[in-house]
UniProtKB/Swiss-Prot annotation:
InterPro entries with a match to the protein in the record: Smg
One Pfam family it belongs to: DUF494
Signal peptide (from-to): none
Entry protein name: Protein Smg
Family: Belongs to the Smg family.
Amino acid sequence: MFDVLMYLFESYIHNETEMRVDQDTLTDDLTRAGFDRNDIYSALSWLEKLADIQEGQTAPLYLANDPLAMRIYTQDETLRLDAECRGFLLFLEQIQVLNLETREMVIERVMALETQEFDLEDLKWVILMVLFNVPGCENAYQQMEELLFEVNDGYVQ
């Protein structure tokens, strides 16, 4: 599923390609690209839920307003997000790439992934996808993109 998300993001979303394709056509295109239909449906569902969060169609998050508050991760979250990932999220909050709401959106979307293996590079891509889909986060998206891509050669770090 994560491979499908990456492919969609790189091929359509990130390149600002016109994505007014119906789901059946997109599914057929992805199947021809070699992806499993179940992974395709899971990825499309993941993106729909991200859009629902972004549009406020899900229940609002109740977050502490205290800037000194520390996020306590659940056991499942610590299994998916290792210390390096959690440290990176904290770093992004400290440099104001993420705020409380976008951090929670990222964690929610990470936990919704159907994958056993997840590392820092995967987290960076999820963060980029979330920031891309949240209005008003253009500067944060640009900062995150700079952290993700090497400016000189364009390769993913």
